[in-house]
């Protein structure tokens, strides 16, 4: 089967999973979330149940319910809903892939298993093929995030093998700082969508020819990142650098506080006004109410909101 249709491009928000105070999934919030992304952040693509969405901490049934609701609420408003279906269990991944196809998702993606890891690149591609064949009508993307999976195969070589073995393969979500490998993916496999996943280095990836970007900060800084992409595409490198440096300064402020994914969920709630709730254990947010003013002040100073 050939997939010669639409390409994934532009910004793709890696969505947080809304939860109640008891850390149960909170489906009614998703409509408000979709409207906020489209109307306030000008983001029309989402990546659901990935790292930002705490996908590995959710049950298969929860992930199915979330996929259905995101697809339902995005219909007619968004361009693409990509469902991450990666699990530690191959059968669960195949089940989620088939479900994503049945509920109307636009594409699927999987991350490399991170406990019992594939022993070789060939084994990983075989694993990918099994999942892709469970939803042969959907474009399939590999999600590369070696910092969490511990799997460091060269992705330009993975693209070659995937091209030979997986008819529905369409590209990679590349969440790593290795811009040489990323650049080779872009230059050697122009038929694939190469989506960059390190928000603070997006401008560098654009210089290498990134087709788009998937990230958590595009939930609440989507418009500003869109401005940076427009400046780059228009040849205004000075403005693009200015915006990227402001975004980096904000992220450095956050990282220096020792914060990560749990705190980014809190920041999204604060900036958007959407009640996303807490992360699910073992994640735990250390943001206190007295931090909110300093976060907003920093973002205002950097002209990010």
From Swiss-Prot:
Subunit comment: Homotetramer.
SMART domains associated with the record: DHDPS
Primary gene name: npl
Top EC class, one word: lyase
GO cellular component: cytoplasm
Protein name: N-acetylneuraminate lyase
Enzyme Commission no: 4.1.3.3
The species this protein was found in: Xenopus tropicalis
GO terms for MF: N-acetylneuraminate lyase activity
